[in-house]
Amino acid sequence: MEIIPVIDLMGGRVVHAKEGLRDYYEPIKSVLTSAIDLSSVVTDLKSFFPFNTVYIADLDAISGQELAVGQYQRLVADFPEISFWLDAGIKEEKDLVVLSNIGGIRPVLASETLHDMTLLPGGEETILSLDFRHGQLLGDSRLWEDENLWPDQVILMHLDYVGNRQGPDMGLLKKVMDRNKEVNVVMAGGVRGDRDLELLNDAGVGKVLVATALHEGGLSRTILEIVTKKHCPMIKGSAINVSKLS
């Protein structure tokens, strides 16, 4: 299982996302970093654990502001070992082209903003995010109704669960897995600690987006080492006591 840290960026600062209520987001408070600028937060995340992938939600770009291309060019130059998944509010092909031209960036096509369905299912690098609020898909209903539009990798992002420490939406995950067992689901929202990772691992999830559990200390370095080992199953029977691990 791969754990992918999430960075929510708004007004040039890293913020704490909760339930998708962006008007109320505040600068992040974290046990891993005292910084709120993008580059420093990535540096501190890498110091904590050798993450291969980092997911960034550029909330300014998602809201329609111009993408700060230079910022991401510098980021990939500073961290060439990291694959950055970036949700920058792609609506149509020209938006996708801008991101695709930044080496080291994998664009995320999010249902909340995507207008051009011809971009899907795309190639093997395509990532679709199915965004939900109150159990309803945000965006074009065809993205839920027609699974032929789904690329190999699909993020399930239930905003009600983001930053809420209530566990992942296993019901939504089951609906997707029942419809298409071949899709590689990336689960997002609600993960509290190792018990939730064990549930997702058992359900066949290979990648998980996490923010709150990392920044509040719910996932230790030892836990991350266990769950990210290739072919290493999660411990059965009882969850690992995170509080006793450093």
PLM features: residue spans?
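Glycine-rich phosphate-binding active-site loops on the catalytic face of alpha/beta enzymes
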Residues: I102-L119, H158-G163, G190-G193, A203-I223
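C-terminal helical cap(s) of enzyme catalytic domains, especially alpha/beta-barrels
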Residues: T118-G122, T126-L128, N201-D202, K207-G237, ...
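Hydrophobic faces of well-ordered beta-strands that scaffold small-molecule active sites
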Residues: E2-L9, V54-I56, F84-A88, P107-L109, ...
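Charged helix-capping and loop-helix junction motifs
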Residues: L67-R74, G139-E145, Q166-K175
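Conserved anion-binding
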Residues: I7-K29, K94-N164
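Short catalytic helix/loop segments, enriched in acidic residues and glycine
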Residues: L21-T43
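N-terminal active-site wall of soluble small-molecule enzyme domains
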Residues: S47-I102, M170
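Catalytic cores of alpha/beta
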Residues: F84-G103, G171-K181, V185-K207
